[in-house]
């Protein structure tokens, strides 16, 4: 160990962000407060299970109530546009930070509370040489439309902020790629690791999984993404554990490629699901419009309970075929329908037909085209990879997914054909019915109908026989026929005019069946590479560092030390003066401690007073700042303070090459060193005594938040 000469405090650089000296209070109590890494936004989780998003001036943007779900953890993504929230029952919700709307909800894979969430972003170099497969045709397609909102369900793609999912990608061929890893941890260890938040590359699906490590209290990832370093509680001690995935190190480009395709296609499949759900809602409006129209006839029939009448459809058919209406039909047309009722029904039907046409032409078909392009690219990659001997995709599974997508497209075109015909025939029917109403109410009926009525009488008959109150469109939504791949009879467009009564819902594959089949086919495509990735995880290190499980940890792998892959870890017990700094380095696929220091804060020396005896300050909380300094929230008697310690001023003791189980003894024998130098120190007034702190290191500024859980108050500061 080499002793160092300490310096007195430098110029004070601590300042409150809120210049009005205002301390914010949350009445229901503070459970968790985190800062956005890219914008000056705060996410607050209250004890009453409310998630509040605020600006740095504490102005509320939105407030979400989770009701009976008990939230346990939350995390921002790097761009600050999404917040992921974990719950006690194991569920996850991803929230749009601009609106507070739900983006995605994921059920719990196991009934354990979410303890930790890390959403890491690394900019890595992917050595991709297959430039022929990097061309992205979807980048030159128009952006997809934003779905209308719904009262029945919360749609992801009703939010304009989520339109970024389908923005054209940057220029292809760039080697630098930003790779995101979303990790969810519970008391057994890592539940799963997703690349780009949705593509699963690791899951603890069995008790023998390498991801089952114990209760995690810290999780760090190396820059090449291949090593995950965790500090866990287990039994009666604290351990340093290393996970290694060779595939991430040796063939990162292939996984990033597949994960990127999977994520984009998953968004498109979800988009299609929401569009089809919207079409079901719109068709429900068609059904309700028809039901309300026919209800006027049924109400009239109920007055004549002693007389037998045909249905409205048959009454109209009999009238148009022989030109003589029954007394009941004449009474219904004269007294119950009228011009106003007919116009309202026509307007409702035309609006629904128009909405369904727009959904098909401007939403479903363009999304299917994009998905076809991506699936074709995936098929090419799988064939190329098979030739090279390192494929992670099965070409046959991709072809099956393309076939399912082809069925959906065929169904949509057939549905559009049917929809256009029914809309046209309905207008002819209404023209004929308007003519009949006029004829019934005139004193001198015309002997010959107008030429327009005569020319379209066949279409009117078809509409009454096959569509009125029993729309052929129903079969596309209520069909019960199972999907059979490579069915040659399915690829012929159904002719609306030639359909007869023998065609029933049993002869149609519904949109719902196709939607579920597409989702299943898509999941099968990427399940094989995902399973391959999950089996690659190896636990290469498990070292006991401390006895007891009441240690708090702050650790990180600084970006400035990426080449060395060093892990800086601070261990402390709350309300005690002891602080341990342990620096570990990756050696032979295992993170091993190489140096450490056991120190405490000499409060008297930190203040620059030589008159006071050594007075060790107790630690309330501390955070590492990118491998260069430490923020320490401390307390001495009634005084509470915050200071920044430079890591260069911390004297280190280097460990000799130890056996794996002897680090515990080496760390426990580190001598205690009083530290009497800091970069700055700030004492707090008695009206606000914080107990914990959070910080965010952004490109523009460094800022943090001090939290007093006892008084449910918080305040932002910069440094």
Swiss-Prot record:
Domain of life, per lineage: Eukaryota
Keywords: Cell cycle, Cell division, Mitosis, Ubl conjugation pathway, WD repeat
Gene3D superfamilies assigned to the protein according to its UniProt record, in alphabetical order: YVTN repeat-like/Quinoprotein amine dehydrogenase (2.130.10.10)
GO terms for cellular component: anaphase-promoting complex; cell division site; cytosol; mitotic spindle pole body; nuclear periphery; nucleus
WD repeat residue numbers: 57-96
InterPro entries reported in the protein's UniProt record: APC4 (IPR024789), Apc4-like_WD40_dom (IPR024977), Apc4_C_schizosaccharomycetes (IPR056357), APC4_long_dom (IPR024790), WD40/YVTN_repeat-like_dom_sf (IPR015943), WD40_repeat_dom_sf (IPR036322)
One record GO biological process: anaphase-promoting complex-dependent catabolic process
Subunit structure: The APC/C is composed of at least 13 subunits: apc1, apc2, nuc2, apc4, apc5, cut9, apc8, apc10, apc11, hcn1, apc13, apc14 and apc15. Interacts with apc1 and dim1.
Role: Component of the anaphase-promoting complex/cyclosome (APC/C), a cell cycle-regulated E3 ubiquitin-protein ligase complex that controls progression through mitosis and the G1 phase of the cell cycle. The APC/C is thought to confer substrate specificity and, in the presence of ubiquitin-conjugating E2 enzymes, it catalyzes the formation of protein-ubiquitin conjugates that are subsequently degraded by the 26S proteasome. Has a role in promoting metaphase to anaphase transition via the ubiquitination of specific mitotic substrates.
Name of the molecule in the record: Anaphase-promoting complex subunit 4
The species this protein was found in: Schizosaccharomyces pombe (strain 972 / ATCC 24843)
UniProt gene name: cut20
């Amino acid at each position: 160990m080499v002793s160092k000469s300490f310096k007195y405090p430098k110029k004070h650089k601590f300042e409150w962000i809120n210049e009005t000296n205002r301390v914010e209070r949350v009445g229901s109590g503070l459970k968790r407060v985190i800062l956005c890494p890219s914008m000056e936004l705060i996410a607050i989780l209250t004890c009453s299970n409310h998630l509040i998003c605020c600006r740095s001036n504490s102005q509320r943007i939105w407030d979400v109530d989770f009701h009976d779900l008990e939230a346990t953890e939350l995390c921002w993504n790097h761009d600050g546009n999404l917040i992921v929230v974990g719950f006690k029952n194991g569920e996850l919700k991803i929230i749009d930070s601009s609106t507070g709307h739900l983006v995605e909800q994921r059920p719990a894979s196991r009934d354990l509370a979410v303890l930790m969430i890390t959403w890491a972003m690394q900019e890595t170099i992917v050595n991709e040489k297959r430039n022929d497969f990097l061309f992205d045709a979807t980048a030159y397609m128009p952006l997809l439309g934003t779905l209308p909102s719904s009262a029945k369900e919360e749609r992801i793609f009703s939010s304009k902020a989520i339109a970024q999912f389908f923005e054209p990608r940057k220029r292809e061929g760039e080697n630098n790629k930003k790779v995101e890893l979303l990790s969810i941890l519970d008391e057994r260890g890592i539940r799963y690791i997703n690349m780009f938040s949705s593509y699963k590359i690791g899951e603890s699906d069995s008790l023998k999984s390498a991801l089952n490590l114990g209760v995690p209290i810290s999780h760090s990832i190396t820059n090449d993404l291949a090593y995950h370093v965790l500090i866990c509680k287990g039994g009666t001690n604290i351990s340093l554990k290393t996970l290694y995935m060779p595939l991430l190190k040796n063939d990162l480009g292939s996984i990033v490629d597949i994960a990127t395709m999977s994520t984009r296609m998953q968004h498109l499949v979800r988009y299609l699901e929401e569009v089809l759900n919207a079409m079901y809602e719109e068709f429900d409006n068609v059904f309700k419009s028809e039901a309300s129209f026919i209800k006027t006839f049924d109400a009239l029939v109920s007055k004549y309970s002693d007389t037998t009448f045909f249905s409205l459809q048959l009454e109209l058919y009999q009238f148009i075929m022989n030109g003589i209406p029954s007394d009941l039909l004449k009474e219904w047309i004269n007294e119950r329908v009228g011009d106003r009722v007919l116009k309202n029904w026509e307007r409702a039907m035309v609006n629904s037909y128009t909405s369904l046409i727009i959904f098909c032409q401007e939403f479903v078909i363009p999304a299917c085209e994009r998905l076809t392009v991506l699936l074709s690219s995936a098929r090419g990659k799988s064939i190329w990879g098979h030739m090279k001997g390192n494929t992670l995709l099965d070409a046959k599974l991709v072809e099956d997914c393309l076939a399912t997508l082809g069925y959906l497209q065929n169904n949509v075109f057939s549905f559009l054909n049917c929809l256009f015909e029914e809309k046209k025939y309905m207008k002819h029917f209404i023209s004929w019915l308007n003519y009949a109403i006029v004829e019934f109410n005139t004193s001198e009926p015309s002997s010959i109908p107008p030429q327009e009525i005569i020319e379209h009488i066949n279409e009117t008959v078809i509409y009454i026989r096959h569509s009125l109150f029993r729309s052929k469109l129903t079969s596309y939504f209520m069909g019960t026929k199972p999907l059979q791949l490579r069915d040659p009879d399915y690829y012929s467009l159904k002719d609306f005019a030639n359909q007869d009564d023998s065609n029933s819902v049993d002869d149609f594959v519904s949109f719902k069946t196709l939607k579920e089949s597409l989702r299943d086919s898509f999941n099968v495509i990427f399940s094989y590479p995902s399973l391959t990735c999950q089996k690659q995880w190896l636990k290469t290190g498990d070292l006991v560092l401390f006895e007891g499980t009441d240690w708090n940890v702050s650790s990180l792998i600084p970006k400035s030390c990426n080449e060395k892959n060093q892990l800086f870890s601070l261990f402390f017990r709350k309300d005690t003066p002891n602080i341990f700094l342990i620096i570990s380095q990756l050696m032979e696929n295992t993170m091993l401690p190489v140096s450490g220091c056991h120190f405490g804060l000499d409060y008297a020396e930190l203040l620059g007073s030589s008159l006071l005896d050594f007075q060790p300050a107790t630690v309330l909380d501390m955070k590492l700042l990118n491998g260069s300094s430490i923020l320490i929230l401390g307390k001495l008697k009634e005084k509470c303070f915050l200071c920044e310690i430079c890591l260069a001023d911390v004297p280190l003791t280097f460990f000799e090459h130890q056996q794996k189980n002897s680090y515990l003894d080496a760390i426990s024998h580190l001598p205690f060193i009083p530290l009497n130098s800091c970069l700055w120190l700030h004492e707090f007034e008695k009206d606000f005594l914080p107990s914990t702190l959070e910080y965010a290191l952004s490109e523009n500024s460094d800022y943090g938040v001090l939290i007093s859980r006892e008084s449910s108050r918080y305040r932002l500061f910069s440094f």
